[in-house]
């Protein structure tokens, strides 16, 4: 009799499990309005040091940037920051190789940033100051400017390559730099001076020299890291050659994130909404056969289309373009950030502009929307599953940010046993670099591990850094903008669903 009852109970359990296995559960989520730090996005902290007077980074100070919301410099608004912009001014090395001492100090900086849980936006330049001596330039910036010749720049990039490769995990993006004052590729002694002091245009030979520098920088980085150029025309001239026209085609979705040179070039605009063309950002600087001339509308269209698939950031530089650079309805600050897919801006400059966003009421939104901001809406999961069998699910999200993540990132569905805490991870196929602004419908089917034991499992989402050195550090994982989902200790996002797992005999 007991044996008969036992068999009945087993049959009952199997039937119930099979019913559960066929059921799908819908979970709905509540959006959070909180401002919180996330990797590789937001307002950055500016920092610079000269090779001739190297000031190293401070770990505790960097940790404070990430963990404590605070105001910086003349800013009226407080921020969390996971990004450090670091200027390395190679003032001692304009005509000679980088020293072993400088390279060691640079490597030490990388270690400090990694230990503090931040990432870096890096630019190298040779000169960050100007001289005026009555020259022709309307801005009063006069030659000699003080940057380095091509042979020296290429030598320095080769010296930097081992460190850039070694520390790519904490490099969010590298800016082209090197050429001209501030590394902005305009006022230069050696790469074609397009100002009134020079030819008033950039000749074909100078475009080729600039392209050689950009190519060397791309080669100095791993294929999974990108270089930002100062103007969209710089990318056109690199991709299509010195004679490229301003109506050259932007990158397509099919080419995006395929590790080619074209797919690894983004933009930094250091005069965001400073004028109708952002002080020459959207300009045609000419060639040997064409003059320098305005190209605002054409270059804006190119920038908007191409920037969907790469890193965009920069800073404001002048408040002369008010009210256009203000909050809506008088201005179009957020509209422009969305159209051009901004992931980051400078909190240190220019706060004459930035503070207006704070006083007018749109800074709170900008802080949350720079880069990505993923919000769970609802999800559909099986009530039960079996070891080794397919596990199909769907998740509906929204990206409320201006852009998608620009560096590759792992996505994991985590199953955590509710009793033992043991973790099983399902690597997912989705690429969140294509999770653009707006609604996202994500559907996948993954096989449950053969080794997963029967029991109840909590489901969680994890978006860890792709580098093993950072993948288990929660400060480098993406937090979703929902109430009651984030686990600060693990970097996981709770999906608020328990799934029953059976074995192959159930």
Regions found by a protein language model. Name each.
Residues 102-119, 142-173, 206-220:
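An active-site-proximal structural segment forming one wall of the substrate-binding cleft
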Residues 46, 170-349:
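Catalytic-core regions of glycoside hydrolase
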Residues 65-131, 136, 152-153, 221, ...:
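Aromatic-lined substrate-binding rim segments of carbohydrate-active enzymes
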Residues 327-381:
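Catalytic cores of secreted or luminal carbohydrate-active enzymes
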Residues 366-506:
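Extracellular/luminal regions of secreted and cell-surface proteins that mediate adhesion/ECM remodeling
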Residues 89-101, 139-151, 193-207:
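The substrate-binding groove and active-site-proximal loops of carbohydrate-active enzymes
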Residues 23-83, 87:
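Boundary/entry segment of secreted carbohydrate-active catalytic domains
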Residues 1-23:
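Bacterial Sec-dependent N-terminal signal peptides
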